[in-house]
Amino acid sequence: DFDEGMNYAKKEKKPILVNFSGHGCVNCRKMEASVWTDEQVNSILTNDVVLITLFVDDKKKLDTPIIIAENGKKRTLETIGDRNSYLQRVKFGANAQPFYVLLNNEGSPLEKAYVFDENPQNFVAFLEKGLKNYN
């Protein structure tokens, strides 16, 4: 959960890495298999950030649907995936996965977002730049 993760990160005094993903996202699985398994990436994800993974295709119903206005129309967010997808579109202006954004404890981006790129060193550079901007 986004809010839960944000609160935890603030308490731990760590930046947040939000991972917008999908259960059916092939490129997301490729990133996890080829990039997240890199020793340096894994160390940063484990020790230096709070990782929040938000699935945009999660079909689990929200306890309470959320009514929003988007593009001049009322719409109801009924599932966790609906809410996560809405958050990605509205807060970060993107609708593709995988999509990674590093945030400070107030929810502001620390670095330009990162999208699909299977080069572990590029992902490390993204993470390190965000960590530097956090400190």
What name fits each language-model region?
Residues S21-H23, E32-D82:
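Thiol-based oxidoreductase modules, predominantly thioredoxin-like and allied folds used
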Residues G24-N27, K59-L62, A96-P98, S108-L110:
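Flexible loop/turn segments at secondary-structure boundaries
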